[in-house]
UniProtKB/Swiss-Prot annotation:
PANTHER family: ZONA PELLUCIDA SPERM-BINDING PROTEIN (PTHR23343), ZONA PELLUCIDA SPERM-BINDING PROTEIN 2 (PTHR23343:SF4). This is Zona pellucida sperm-binding protein 2. Glycans are attached at N105, N122, T462. Disulfide bonds join C55-C138, C88-C106, C372-C465, C403-C424, C545-C615, C566-C634, C620-C630. Keywords: Cell membrane, Cleavage on pair of basic residues, Disulfide bond, Extracellular matrix, Fertilization, Glycoprotein, Membrane, Receptor, Secreted, Signal, Transmembrane, Transmembrane helix. Residues 1-38 form the signal peptide. GO terms for molecular function: acrosin binding; coreceptor activity; identical protein binding; structural constituent of egg coat. The record marks A172, D173, H640, R641 as: Cleavage. Component of the zona pellucida, an extracellular matrix surrounding oocytes which mediates sperm binding, induction of the acrosome reaction and prevents post-fertilization polyspermy. The zona pellucida is composed of 3 to 4 glycoproteins, ZP1, ZP2, ZP3, and ZP4. ZP2 may act as a secondary sperm receptor. Residues 371-637 form the ZP domain. Can form homopolymers that assemble into long fibers (in vitro). Polymers of ZP2 and ZP3 organized into long filaments cross-linked by ZP1 homodimers. Interacts with ZP3.
Length: 745
């Protein structure tokens, strides 16, 4: 006979005390091989019933044996006296040879269950003549019918236990005087993995069965055979399918149960209580607490948020919880009296009842010791791993103020506080011969009072330090003359000069990519910027930028690119400055420009070797510019800027990480001739008109932006050559004159 039990909750006492329960369905199969009481009304005999009776949760099913004479009999439900029951509705199926009747109107309530009487009569005989009556007993199927027992599973630390009603007095193994040996067998697991054990075998593997007058209690350890373990992170769930079979003379009882157990405690913070369950085949159907049954679709409207990614997390607003005073806690404790979670599982409904409690609301730790410094501070360090999940160090504050740490290293998970004894909410008190100073470091929640889910770890740490009374600090005001105004000067700055592939300025060239190769008239994009500064009131201003043939920025010859913060106005292709957009945090910390690659010449020779670039710059105060270069407007008289510019000590010089190799388009110095060496003249104009383009060149300059002696020398050579030509011409004319004079004579 198959019996299904459903029940409420039961809190066992004594060794059964536990804080977690799993509510699950139980199926009890009870096959009656013989009835307990068979009566022939006419003959008063008790023949054994040859069929099978099955007790379900709602009805009784009687199965008659198949024999050649079965079509000649008739069966009906009657009362114990053999009289018809007019309110009883039953179904007699001659084809299947079954009779089905409900408990409500077709049975009589007896102690521990239901009693039903049927009458079987041969159709060929006279009415009631030769009729046989059989009485059957079915145990109470509902848990509430069995003296208040509960079908809930209790979760202990290492095992789960559940109770079943004791439906017959002979179920216990205490009938040693009987000739027939009764026994239990246990089937653990589901499907092909199911394993059947005798009771002694199960006891050896850690199972246990306890039977008293009203109930049977079965213990299943978490590591037993057939128990499925689901784990995800730090959360665990155990699930098991069981069949307990008891065989006794004339009857066979099978209890079938499926149980789930989640033994992990809940976690709590300032706003919510969180229950975590790992991923398993069950699907949440409803949540019940405080006489409320809430469907999963209505959880959010009732202050519960469901997070169904990677398992399941239920976040209960603390406004739903109760509070109580506990001997274990200094402050009040949040809890729920009971919480039932109902799941759809294979394909039955399985419920789990738990009793969640938050841990005590007390400070995480109290730090004492030699923390007080001689200058009146407390120094303390806080690490992110002091809570689980890790602490968000950016939310830490001291006392009732906004005092923040003096040092923070997120990569190391460390912050350091330097707490003044006379500030940041520090309190003091006298204890014996000591003065004790106390403060609290805590994390703040932006959503308190609760308005959203907060998964931040709660952190409160009390820090204390003390002085001896004899060493107590004294505050003394010493009047003195007003000190002179300090001379303010900016501290050291670090600049960097880099080159970029294009004007997007996304990624600079690395040091291992130098020397860079550039062809004539190809732009070279450069950037100067300030490193490791977050001050929005400073501004980077270029002074000069120039090129040299060696890595020494002071070497000669030099070729100017930027002079006094402006493009060099003697170039054929002038330097172009690029604005710095909002893509960077502090645009005033950058200067960007590009120059066109030219053939660099010195002393009438074109240099095709490596060229090094350098820049000098200074840092200006945007709020109070202290140098004319801080507010340059181009073009401006170079002489005027030089006269009022910054001193050399205020400037900083930076260089590119490596040189640039300047080549012509065909990797030779095509188009570069003597005409290119002349600063002006018809030959230069003729060259440009014949070729239709300008082949740029730069003459070497001194540091003031003027032509160097090498270029002046080339002009002198040209002048001497011209003078020699004139002398030769005059000599040739004189020669012709003398020759004509001789011939005339």
């Amino acid at each position: 006979m198959a019996c299904r039990q459903r029940g409420g909750s039961w809190s066992p006492s004594g060794w059964f005390n536990a804080g977690w329960s799993t509510y699950r369905s139980i199926s009890l199969f009870f096959a009656l091989v013989t009835s307990g009481n068979s009566i022939d009304v006419s003959q008063l005999v008790n023949p054994a019933f040859p069929g099978t009776v099955t007790c379900d949760e709602r009805e009784i099913t009687v199965e008659f044996p198949s024999s050649p004479g079965t079509k000649k009999w008739h069966a009906s439900v009657v009362d114990p006296l053999g009289l018809d029951m007019p309110n009883c509705t039953y179904i007699l199926d001659p084809e299947k040879l079954t009779l089905r009747a409900t408990y409500d109107n077709c049975t009589r309530r007896v102690h521990g269950g239901h009693q039903m009487t049927i009458r079987v009569m041969n159709n060929s005989a006279a009415l009631r003549h030769g009729a046989v009556m059989y009485q059957f007993f079915c145990p109470a199927m509902q848990v509430e019918e069995t003296q208040g027992l509960s079908a809930s599973t209790i979760c202990q630390k290492d095992f789960m236990s559940f109770s079943l009603p004791r439906v017959f007095s002979g179920l216990a193994d205490d009938s040693k005087g009987t000739k027939v040996q009764m026994g239990w067998s246990i089937e653990v697991g589901d499907g092909a993995r199911a394993k059947t054990l005798t009771l002694p075998e199960a006891m050896k593997e850690g199972f246990s069965l306890l039977i008293d007058n009203h109930r049977m209690t079965f213990h299943v350890p978490f590591n037993a055979t057939g128990v499925t373990h689901y784990v995800q992170g730090n959360s665990h769930l155990y699930m098991v399918s069981l069949k307990l079979t008891f065989i006794s003379p004339g009857q066979k009882v099978i209890f079938s149960s499926q149980a789930i157990c989640a033994p992990d405690p809940v976690t709590c913070n300032a706003t919510h209580m969180t229950l975590t369950i790992p991923e398993f085949p069950g699907k949440l159907k409803s949540v019940s607490f405080e006489n409320q049954n809430i469907d999963v679709s209505q959880l959010h409207d009732n202050g519960i948020d469901l997070e169904a990614t990677n398992g399941m997390k239920l976040h209960f607003s603390k406004t739903l919880l109760k509070t109580k005073l506990s001997e274990k806690c200094l402050l009040h404790q949040f809890y729920l009296a009971s919480l039932k979670l109902t799941f759809l599982l294979r394909p039955e409904t399985v419920s789990m009842v738990i009793y969640p409690e938050c841990l005590c609301e007390s400070p995480v730790s109290i730090v004492t010791g030699e923390l007080c410094t001689q200058d009146g501070f407390m120094d303390v360090e806080v690490y992110s791993y002091q809570t689980q999940p890790a602490l968000d160090l950016g939310t830490l504050r001291v006392g009732n103020s906004s005092c923040q740490p003096v040092f923070e290293a997120q990569s190391q998970g460390l912050v350091r506080f330097h707490i003044p004894l006379n500030g940041c909410g520090t309190r003091y008190k006298f204890e014996d011969d000591k003065v004790v100073y106390e403060n609290e470091i805590h994390a703040l929640w932006t959503d308190f009072p609760p308005s959203k889910i907060s998964r931040d770890s709660e952190f409160r740490m009390t820090v204390k330090c003390s002085y001896s009374r004899n060493d107590m600090l004294l505050n003394i005001n010493v009047e003195s003359l007003t000190p002179p105004v300090a001379s303010v000067k900016l501290g050291p700055f670090t600049l960097i000069l880099q080159s970029y592939p294009d004007n997007s300025y996304q990624q600079p060239y690395g040091e291992n990519e130098y020397p860079l190769v550039r062809f004539l008239r190809q732009p070279i994009y450069m950037e100067v910027r300030v490193l490791n500064r977050d001050d929005p009131n400073i501004k980077l201003v270029l002074d000069d930028c120039w090129a040299t043939s060696t890595m020494d920025p002071d070497s000669f010859p030099q070729w100017n690119v930027v002079v006094d913060g402006c493009a060099y106005d003697l170039d054929n292709y002038q330097t172009t400055f690029h604005p710095v957009g909002s893509s960077v945090t502090h645009p005033d910390h950058y200067q960007r420009f590009d120059m066109k690659a030219f053939a660099f010449v010195s002393e009438a020779h074109v240099l095709s070797s490596l060229v090094y670039f350098h820049c000098s710059a200074l840092i200006c105060n945007r709020l109070s510019p202290d140098s004319p270069l801080c507010s340059v407007t181009c073009p401006v008289s170079s002489r005027h800027r030089r006269a009022t510019g910054a001193t050399e000590a205020e400037k900083m010089t930076v260089s590119l990480p490596g040189p640039i190799l300047l080549l012509s388009d065909d990797s030779s110095f095509r188009g570069v001739g003597s005409s290119d060496l002349k600063a002006s003249g018809s030959s230069g104009e003729k060259s440009r008109s014949e070729t239709g383009e300008e082949v740029g060149s730069r003459g070497a300059m001194d540091t003031k932006g003027h032509k160097t002696a090498g270029d002046v020398g080339s002009k002198a050579v040209a002048a001497v050559a011209a003078f020699a030509g004139v002398v030769a011409t005059l000599g040739f004319i004189y020669y012709l004159y003398e020759k004509r004079t001789v011939s005339n004579h």
